[in-house]
Structure formats: structure tokens, C-alpha cells
Amino acid sequence: ETGDCEVGDKYEGMVHINDATIYFPDMGEIVPIKDELLKTSESNDFVFCMFGINPDLKKFSFTDEQKEKMLSFGDTALVVLDSEEFIRRVNIAAKNAGYQAEFNSVNYYNPNIDGGNMLFSLGAGMWNIAFWKRDSYIYQQEVRFVFRPGAENVDHIELDIGDISDITAIISAEKALSAIVQNEAPIEDE
């Protein structure tokens, strides 16, 4: 959490329980839980967040809300032109540094409703908690890497992914936010 509610979120990496009870059979006790944040074994993993455009969309443009809020993130944008190669390079660098890495889109949830989807996704790996965020951040349209350092106790990590100028472009944030992206690739029917 950064203290800036547009950038940091105390709910990140935590399981938010709106209204539930936990039964402790050894003590025969039922404990009510109301609006609590529960840490997980993965609450201190590291994430690298980026804005992502759904590749299945034929056309994309930023909403007025995105334009307004995202200009505060900085004046420059790094556009990844080859996402598959970018992901491959980051995964190789993470593996070489001894970290497990996962990449996925962020799912957004209503914090006033206890939904089963988040808990269900944690069954596939507790690290999936990094891909859940309150719906007040949906405008960020994030994709993320989560890096799992294992037992290592560090406050940050740095990865050398090498020169990426062949798969990226640097443009002004204003230009990026006013762009209209058109997908010329044929989209397969399911």
C-alpha cells in the first residue's frame, strides 16, 4: 500500500471476507467474521503490473475515466508490441534468478459480496490471490506478473530482462491514452 488509493490498495494479496463464520472444532467455537482481510501465504509475493488490452477485441480505445485517472501515473508509456516475447523474456529472467513467475489478467470483484470465484481460484494455487482486485480499480485493466521468491525474505526484487527495444515503443502517455487500437488479426470463432 502506498497511501495513494489510486496506486496502492490494502486489499491487495489478501482474502476479503465480507460476512462469514469460522468453526474451530477443537474448541467447539464459532467465530463470526465481518469485513476482515486475511493474509495468505502469498501475501508478500511481488507483482509487476501493466495495463493490458484484451487481444480478442477488434477495436479498443480508452474511456474518459481511464484517460483522467491514468494521466496521474506518469507522462510516458512503454508499449509492448510483442506480448508473447515479453512474457517469455520475463519468465526466463525470473527462472534464472530463482523465482517462480505467473502471468495473467486481473479479475475484479465487488468487495460487498462474498464470491466463490476468488476462493475457487485459490484452489489452483494460493498465488492466484495476486490476480484479484476490488472493482473500484477496474479502469486499470491490469495484467500482472507475480513472482514467488519462496523462503527468501527480501523487500523487493530486480530482474534483468535485457534490452527490449526490439519489442517495445516509448510514447507519451497522452498519445497512448488517445490511441485507438485496431486488431487486424482474424479472430477465431469458438
Task: Please annotate each region the language model reported.
Residues 1-190:
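NAD-dependent ADP-ribosyltransferases
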